[in-house]
Amino acid sequence: IQKAPFAKLASVLGNQASLIQRLSFGVDDRAVEASRRIKSIGDESTYEKDLTEPADIDRQIAIHSDVVAKRLRRHKLAGRTISLKVRFASFRTVTRSLSLEEGTDLQEEIYAAALELKKRIYMNEGVRLIGVTASNLAPPLETVDLFSTVREKQVKAAAVMDAIQEKFGEHALRKGFWLEEEKRKEMEEKEKENKEAPEEE
């Protein structure tokens, strides 16, 4: 996007082309409208079929981290405390939290914190529910000049993705774990249909 000719971007993105190209360079001059009344932002799901595979559990944590990060950015907020909630098949519910050195609105950082919290939970049975929450909220204080190279790229990528999804919809550009989740749901649906299908005599 940074190297693309503006005319070509405009033909695809329309009026949003200038904004999206500026965001790709880390320039965001939109007004900050943070709500101080919001104390926490979270997302959770209850699963029809208990999750037992570590890869499936981690993918759900990634998805919820992504949803939370998007909501934080939408409200121009960053969360310093990250919490992971896990409910097992036995309805045993465990919540763990940790505080970061600085607030974040990035999926990658929220996900990393949630995975660290998962290590503190005894995962000895199927998982019925997973939730990720960010609290201790405040407007982001960082400036792009202070970011590490990796974090700067993550910030720019998140801004570009937000702008594209805002214009073209959530499915216009998605991270890989969302696509993997869609495949998992399709497989579950097929298994359900096969079980419900009448047996041939």
Please identify what each model-predicted range represents.
Residues 2-126:
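DNA-contacting surface of Y-family translesion DNA polymerases
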Residues 102-201:
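Acidic, metal-coordinating catalytic segment for phosphate/diphosphate chemistry
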